């Protein structure tokens, strides 16, 4: 089995290296990841300057670009074969609810999917038990060998930050939602220039039973199928009726 791994925390992050160690038990692992932390990069591509790469070891490539750049480069240039799966992670922290819109980890999996390779994103809801998340991924990848992912779907997996033996199982979930994050943190640099930091994410808003938030609170692994098609299919008819009315004015 051939596995491509990427992330948004950077090639030297603990999560991706723990993941690579465990998945290497299943086959050949190649890491192509950002040269530094690119959290929050979403699906951005680098278009205003060329990408530079560096070989960090055997089958380990760092890229001075976004997670999407990394997977795009790996699949379209670096690898001379198609991997069996793209695994993005292990993210340092949750990707729950609308986090997925900003997540570079989810974006790396999305790019793999765009380019025709089955893909999953894995996040640890914390920063301690990366071994737990890695074992969860290993189990899922083994099962994917026997039964592939549903067509046109990406799996977004969030693992509670607890020892593997304490997990209560898994739950297929929908995305929950957070309250809007409105806080900005104002600061002043040593030269007296004003600067701003983005504040913390909003608190949970939609986090009831059936959501990814609820699952991890119950010490369950949350597995959320995602799709790339952003069309609001249930709104097509109503928007067409609205446009017909607008067109008469």
From Swiss-Prot:
EC number from the UniProt entry: 3.1.3.5
Single GO term (MF): exopolyphosphatase activity
Cellular compartments annotated: Cytoplasm
Enzyme class: hydrolase
Tagged with keyword Metal-binding: yes
Family indicated by similarity: Belongs to the SurE nucleotidase family.
Cofactor note: Binds 1 divalent metal cation per subunit.
Sites where the protein binds a divalent metal cation: 8-9, 39, 91
GO cellular component, one term: cytoplasm
Function recorded in the entry: Nucleotidase that shows phosphatase activity on nucleoside 5'-monophosphates.
InterPro entries, per the entry: SurE (IPR030048), SurE-like_Pase/nucleotidase (IPR002828), SurE-like_sf (IPR036523)
Listed name of the protein: 5'-nucleotidase SurE
UniProt keyword annotation of Ribosomal protein present: no
Keywords tagged on the record: Cytoplasm, Hydrolase, Metal-binding, Nucleotide-binding
Pfam families: SurE
Organism per entry: Photobacterium profundum (strain SS9)
Chief location category: cytoplasm
Transmembrane domains' residue ranges: none
């Amino acid at each position: 089995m051939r596995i491509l791994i990427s992330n948004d925390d950077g090639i030297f992050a603990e999560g991706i290296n723990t993941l690579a160690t465990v998945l290497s038990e299943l086959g050949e692992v190649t890491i192509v990841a950002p040269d530094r932390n690119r959290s929050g990069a979403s699906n951005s591509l680098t278009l205003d300057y060329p990408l530079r790469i560096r070989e960090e070891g055997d089958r380990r490539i760092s890229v001075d670009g976004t997670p999407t750049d990394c997977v795009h480069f790996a699949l379209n240039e670096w690898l001379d074969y198609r991997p069996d799966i793209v695994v993005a992670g292990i993210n340092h922290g949750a990707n729950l609810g609308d986090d997925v819109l900003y997540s570079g980890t989810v974006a790396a999996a999305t790019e793999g999917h765009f380019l025709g390779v089955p893909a999953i994103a894995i996040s640890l809801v914390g920063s301690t038990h990366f071994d737990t998340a890695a074992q969860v991924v290993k189990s899922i990848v083994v099962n994917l060998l026997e039964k592939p992912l549903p067509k046109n779907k990406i799996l977004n997996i969030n693992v509670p930050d607890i020892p593997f033996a304490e997990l209560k199982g898994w739950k297929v979930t929908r995305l929950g939602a957070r309250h809007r994050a409105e806080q900005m943190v104002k600061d002043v640099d040593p030269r007296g220039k004003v600067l701003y930091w983005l504040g913390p994410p909003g608190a949970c808003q939609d986090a009831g039973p059936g959501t990814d938030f609820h699952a991890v609170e119950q010490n369950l692994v949350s597995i959320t199928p995602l799709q790339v098609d952003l069309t609001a299919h249930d709104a097509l008819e109503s928007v067409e009726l609205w446009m017909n009315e607008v067109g008469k004015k």
